Amino acid sequence: MSKHTYNRNIEITHHAMQRLEERVKNYKGFKSWQELVRTARYKGRSEQNMTDAEYQWYSTHITNLHSSSQVRIMNGFAYLFMGNKGHARTLVTVIQVA
């Protein structure tokens, strides 16, 4: 019986978000959440960066994540998603946690 917890979606609480921020800030090379957003990669969009409009939106909302935000842990990386009231979640950033 294999466990697939690495594939599990985890709803983010305010406390969990703080812990994730702490972990990111302790990560070598950390600059800022805005820098992480600026260099975020979209799943299915190859190595393409966010557009300027997308970056502007996320840079103003990244410090005010809400209950629809999620982290998906997979293969040693934390994928941070954001979503609004039923809208599709969008990949914001990827953080190595292993």
Tell where the protein language model's regions lie, with residue ranges.
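Ribonuclease/tRNase effector modules and their secretory precursors
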Residues: M1-A98
